């Protein structure tokens, strides 16, 4: 499976949710994050959900989390 790591894409959103310690909630943006349409899990293809989960899991495994001080 080839992973699209573009900003706002499913992999990026999964890794960002993990980084900021947000709950797992598959979604992505059609273009720029927060400046374009958000696609919710119910409208995502199986591969897009898998990419989101991979991004989330990769970040969890790396232990790279926001330090809220």
Regions found by a protein language model. Give the residues of each.
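Intrinsic-disorder/low-complexity detector
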Residues: 1-69
């Amino acid at each position: 499976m080839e992973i699209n790591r573009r900003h706002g894409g499913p992999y990026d959103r999964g890794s960002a949710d993990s980084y900021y310690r947000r709950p797992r909630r598959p979604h992505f943006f059609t273009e720029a994050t927060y400046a374009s349409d958000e696609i919710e899990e119910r409208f995502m293809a199986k591969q897009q959900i898998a990419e989101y989960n991979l991004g989330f899991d990769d970040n969890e495994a790396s232990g790279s989390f926001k330090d809220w001080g």
